[in-house]
Design a protein with these regions (language model features):
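Intrinsically disordered, low-complexity regions
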Residues: 5-7, 117
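Structured C-terminal cap/extension of enzyme domains
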Residues: 16-118
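Distinct, well-ordered alpha-helical segments
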Residues: 1-3
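Structural preference for beta-strand elements that scaffold enzyme active sites
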Residues: 7-11, 27-28
Length: 118
């Protein structure tokens, strides 16, 4: 199946749906995950485009805990927190954004470590 039919390019905007959107004819991603795992996000797409759908799917599944943690609070709070945890210097929050709940921050830190980016 193909979405867009060559008239419009479709990009996945949900990190938990990269492979399904590509399978429907999507051409790429607009991704929160790519801020903390750019190489891995690129590889998910590249494997798919190279015909390694199973490998792409497995990488997508491997990223699911991190994807879920990156959206456990209002965006962009988790991704900014993740970047700060990674030493990327994303800075302090400005109103109306605030720090993550402690339990969610611990969940995010664990997901980053488990995924190998922290």
């Amino acid at each position: 199946a193909a979405i867009g039919q060559g008239v419009v390019d479709i990009y996945s905007g949900n990190d938990d749906q990269i492979v399904p959107i590509l399978a429907l004819g999507g051409v790429g991603v607009i991704s929160v995950l790519s801020n903390v795992a750019p190489t891995q996000t690129h590889e998910i797409c590249q494997k798919f485009f190279d015909g390694d759908v199973a490998g792409s799917r497995q990488m997508q599944l491997d990223a699911m805990d991190l994807c879920n943690a990156l959206f456990c609070e209002v965006n962009p709070i988790p991704v900014k927190t993740a970047l700060n945890m990674m030493g990327m210097g994303a800075g302090a929050f400005r109103m109306p954004l605030c720090e993550m709940e402690e339990a969610n921050a611990k969940r995010l830190e664990k997901a980053l470590k488990d995924y190998g980016v922290l």
